[in-house]
Amino acid sequence: MMKIVLLNGSPRPQGNTAKMASAFRTAAEEAGHQVVQFDVCRMNIKGCLACEYCHGRGNGECIQKDDMHRIYAELKDTEMLVLAAPIYYHGISGQLKCAIDRFYSALYPKAPESLKYISMFLASGDKEQYTGARFSFDGDFLGYLGLEDKGFFTSAGEVQEETLDEIRRMAKDL
């Protein structure tokens, strides 16, 4: 059994991103994995202050007192991180970006030993909109943190059943 943290960065509870996240979560849980999902658009997560408290007196803890601490608690022993978001202006939603920026205290300079894998689900109105998100995914999560890519899934327009099936297969094969 694997522990997985899923961050859903979509404000639309029935939108394409939510459908992709739900397909993953259901299949992963059916395969015996524990999935802890956070809908970051419904959480109180402030932007990083760049104060460096976390890398000084905070000893890895962020000075801000908001809902991000719930995510930090789960990241400490998770094996996989799944990021799901709609694309706005060639990048992920601001809410998910804000949460990722706050990973600075928990994942930098080094991710927890347990964290090995990552996957990303993106939805947009056009198949040409993923370049910015892909650049960040490859550079930050695969490159800098050295996580293993378990899949980068995209859906332009209405999410297709074929895409959902690919996500389900990946979840079951973990």
Q: What feature does the model see in each segment?
A:
Residues M1-A84, H90-S105, G143, D149-K150, ...:
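N-terminal beta1-alpha1-beta2 submodule of the flavodoxin-like/Rossmannoid cofactor-binding fold
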Residues I87-Y89, G125-D126:
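Short glycine-rich anion-binding loops that position phosphate/pyrophosphate groups of nucleotides
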Residues G94, P109-G151:
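Short, glycine-/small-residue-rich phosphate/pyrophosphate-handling segment
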